Amino acid sequence: MEKLCAKCGQVFQAKRRALLYCSYSCSNAVTAAAREDRKLDGTVSASVWSCGGGVQSTAIAILIIQGKLPKPDYAIMTDVSHEKQETWEYVHGHLRPRLEEIGVRLEIIPTADYIDPSVLEPTGFVRIPAFKRGVEGETIKFQTHCSGLWKASVSRRWLRQKGVKRASNWIGISADEKRRARTSTLRWIELRYPLIDLGITREDCLWLISNAGWVRPPRTSCHLCPLQTDSSWLRTKQHYPDDWALAVAAERKIQEQNPDVYLHKSLVPLNDVKFEPTWKELMTECETPGVQ
């Protein structure tokens, strides 16, 4: 089975479900790090906010600005090279300037400085949750490796380079999605969920954003993410032609080595898909800038 190494973030073939590391080298490195951490008991934990640029992250930014959450020691966001243009427009046009007004710098960490953000490995392995047709005609979705590989592992390496020995990592998951909350597998990182702690739902986040007089942020995702709704795909196609062209090009690149793999669940090439947004998707899209 394919798994993500808990140390280096690389995908590997695990012979047993319990395996966490791709090699003895990674396993030994973790053991050595844990031994070193035991020597550092009592080390002050740095507060690190992982910003995603969307609704929940914007609500956290407002709570920080209003003094309802403390200023983090580090505010970080990874640039995986595939994020949508409208996300960066919001981050650079709203989030970063307003955070800088209170002395909080949102650090943008390029994934490419640490790891290859290509959607394909040299072997042809697809790193994103694309779709293919099974032997009996069913739709098969690939596992999701991109988030851990391009974001979490990169953030950890950046923090280590900054000399962070222990971290309290804030994640923007709201109270209505608390099932997504998890505990860290790393001894030096404690995952915290400030919105869950405060009982703030996504609807509450939208109210906070509106009440503060801010423009509502778009839903964040990569322009080539196969898990997008039809509404999101259609929005990209109609309003962000550069992102659309990149997604089409990425699919064609994948199909050079994997001709039966597609970015849309219909198993049809993107340029030929007839997108059919649901009423619920369209109502959600009305929360985002550009369609108001």
Question: Can you say where each PLM-predicted feature lies in the sequence?
Answer:
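BZIP DNA-binding basic region
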Residues: 1-37
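Nucleotide-activated chemistry modules centered on ATP-dependent adenylation/adenylyltransferase
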Residues: 37-292
